[in-house]
Curated annotation (Swiss-Prot):
Residues 602-619 have a biased composition (Low complexity). It comes from Shewanella loihica (strain ATCC BAA-1088 / PV-4). The gene is dnaK. This is Chaperone protein DnaK. Transmembrane segments: none annotated. Residues 602-637 are annotated as: Disordered. One of its GO terms (molecular function) is ATP-dependent protein folding chaperone.
Amino acid sequence: MGKIIGIDLGTTNSCVAVLDGDKARVIENAEGDRTTPSIIAYTGEEVLVGQPAKRQAVTNPKNTFFAIKRLIGRRFKDDEVQRDVDIMPFKIIAADNGDAWVEAHDKKMAPPQVSAEILKKMKKTAEDYLGEPVTEAVITVPAYFNDSQRQATKDAGRIAGLEVKRIINEPTAAALAYGIDKKQGDNIVAVYDLGGGTFDISIIEIDSVDGEQTFEVLATNGDTHLGGEDFDNRLINYLADEFKKEQSLDLRNDPLAMQRLKEAAEKAKIELSSTTQTEVNLPYITADATGPKHLVVKITRAKLESLVEDLIQRSLEPLKVALADADLSVSDINEVILVGGQTRMPKVRAEVSAFFGKELRQDVNPDEAVAIGAAVQAGVLAGDVKDVLLLDVTPLSLGIETMGSVMTKLIEKNTTIPTKASQTFSTADDNQSAVTIHVLQGERKQSSANKSLGQFNLEGIEPAPRGMPQIEVAFDIDADGILHVSATDKKTGKAQNITIKASSGLSDEEVEAMVRDAEAHADEDAKFEELVSARNQADGMVHATKKQIEEAGDALPSEDKEKIEAAMADVDTATKGNDKEAIEKATQALMEASAKLMEIAQAKAQAGQGEQAQQSNEAPADDVVDAEFEEVKDDKK
């Protein structure tokens, strides 16, 4: 059997490693480099990847793609995609299904298709080193990648001719690389991963006993649209603004100038990690009627730090959430590992060190640790690495939409994967023959505040009073963090299932704010939940009262019937509003108005007609959650 390789598919740079004996080794590419720029160029005649693509970017900006990982699994209309549309020299377009795609030489391409070119380069690099074909790989993704982004990464692997044996989270891979040689004791490690396009924080416990190691992720958090590219963009915009002030020309309208500006900004940022001042000097950056124009701007480290200060602070918020989720304090963290090229910035290192109150580990290569960890995991899967157990988690809660537009969670965030969960739900209407299962991801109570992952129909439910059918919804997350959902009618055995392949990624605000928003809006969510509960109780009371009126027939005096119907109308009006007290008051008034109905029901029961009353008041099983599924219309079938 051939080797399984480990690939760090990065936003800015990618890296490939393989287990060589009992050590993971990073493989140098054809250019002699240990990392490969994640840049792809279409010249019209050939596809260039890595340094060759980067070298020709200035002369071919519209057909040279970089940071493509920021588009993978996302919709064109997403806010963060729209921000990139304005500053990228290449064309980002909307695909027919609304996804964010790119275009080169009038050819439309999906991000997984472009990312596959990088994976092909990694595959070839490994094959040249090993001297044998490579068909299997472990590929890393940001811990906070959602379901569709993980699926899109697997698709890229398949396009590149690789069977993706496992998708592994980048901080977890870095912890594997760090901890694999440390064979004794317990360590709680914080992995701060600020890469080219994404940010993750994972709190990981490494337990080593008698040569056996367990790597357990306690909590993870992050932002899938925060990274070195954003730091570069701050500097690019600053340089463009300075030039505009001086020359009254906006370089943002010139793709060639923007490509040169991007390269210069990235170079200046890197230089300012080792020096306190640098100069950006770009002769002949553009021209107007008066002649050629040159850009010359001095930048200090302090100026760069002021431009990106809020980005660094943004990365600290998820640290607080992750610690709280793990039920730990800063003092419980034994080691802090920095991963990702952007962590070389002194200001980033200083802020993270200050946050945790301790020195940072210096023995982890921020560019290579993730690929090495992926190679270790590949060795575990191949059986070459023994006595290592990796327990990863799902970053966001998963559930379905139920009655009152509430998200009912089946799997909580930071649950160890793989995992399964199921719950029994029922119908909202009498004789409902079909339900729609709406799958959601996020932390808020209101369905609309969470990410919709997809929906599917379960049809052929036998006619029955509402609340009687028992529909079991099961969630199954595999080791890659990809979700499979099924719904089964317990009575008929009819089932429907889906592997979630949502075409959209989480937007910047959704990803970054989901957990924090849930905490910030805790009171709002609690009130919303109480309001929905009051509405559901009121609806249930109206439904039961209508049935009792039918059963009472002529035994119910018309005067009482009119009072009850008026009370039901009041309940109906109240439930359309957002006043919980008004709904509860109207429900109580209906109960009081229905006193005569209770007397009639009791009289009928005493007269020996209890069987019919028992059937009409029969309740669903205890484990059935009152849920509302929209009935499938003809045009949805």
